[in-house]
């Protein structure tokens, strides 16, 4: 669906806007990153999965009034969840190298200091790792 949308947009995009680029249509993804100090990569991963499950469960509960485990599981499959290395791998596996990702870090997380740490870890650990994987460095 996404590739066909890009193909269609490249044909109909107004010339005044320049040529269509994949980055013109950001891909939205919830990010449940745990890069907290004092935890092993395995502990970070487990904590990120717990945090994602709780947040996504609350999301579906708020939308529909009941928690449907299959919907929580499906939403979790679309989110980026884990420690920095896991999220870098998920980005490379799921997204085209020219995609622009609109990452949501604060989804149901009201701890602004933690959200800031997560965003910093994403830019300092995840983004460079993705670049290294894509360039073979």
Task: Give the residues covered by each predicted segment.
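An alpha-helical appendage that flanks or caps ligand/catalytic pockets
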Residues: 1-99, 131-137
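Conserved strand-to-helix beginnings and helix N-cap segments that scaffold or border functional pockets
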Residues: 2-3, 113-119
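Short, electropositive alpha-helical surface patch
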Residues: 49-50, 116-124
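A generic structural signal for solvent-exposed, polar alpha-helical segments
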Residues: 65-66, 110, 127-128
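Glycine-rich, proline-tolerant flexible connector loops at the mouths of alpha/beta enzymes
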Residues: 104-115
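Alpha-helix-loop-beta-strand connector modules within alpha/beta enzyme cores
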Residues: 120-134
């Amino acid at each position: 669906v996404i590739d066909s949308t890009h193909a269609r947009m490249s044909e109909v995009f107004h010339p005044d806007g320049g040529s269509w680029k994949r980055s013109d249509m950001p891909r939205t993804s919830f990010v449940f990153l745990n890069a907290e100090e004092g935890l092993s990569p395995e502990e970070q991963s487990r904590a990120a999965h717990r945090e994602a499950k709780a947040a996504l469960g609350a999301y579906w509960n708020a939308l529909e009034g009941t928690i449907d485990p299959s919907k929580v599981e499906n939403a979790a499959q679309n989110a980026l969840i884990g420690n920095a290395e896991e999220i870098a791998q998920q980005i490379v596996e799921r997204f085209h190298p020219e995609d622009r990702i609109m990452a949501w870090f604060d989804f149901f997380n009201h701890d602004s200091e933690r959200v800031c740490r997560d965003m910093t870890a994403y830019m300092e650990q995840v983004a460079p790792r993705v670049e290294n994987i894509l360039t073979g460095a």
